[in-house]
Amino acid sequence: MNKFEAVILFSPDLSNPIINKEEDKFNKIVEALKGKIHEKENWGLKDLSYAINNYKKAFYKYYQIEILGSELKNIKKTLTQNEKILRHLFIKVNEHQELPTKMKNNEEK
């Protein structure tokens, strides 16, 4: 099993219940592929550096997951096909960082 940190950007048009439903879908996908979500953080609505699909803001969600690298392509394919998700990024790490993340700390200031 490999460790990954993931950031998923959701459309700013979505309400909290819809975002929660999309998060549940992501959780189920990871679990179905024998993976595990260790931690997650809500970074909230943030400005984008550049417009994505004519949006200048997005809801950021951060995850620490553990899954086989070979299964990651299935997750990426599913996320790419979801119109409610603007972007996603997975980074392989040796160890997960301690929470709260620096991004979360900046939000609280």
Regions found by a protein language model. Give the residues of each.
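Structured, basic alpha/beta domains of bacterial-type, RNA-associated proteins
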Residues: 2-109
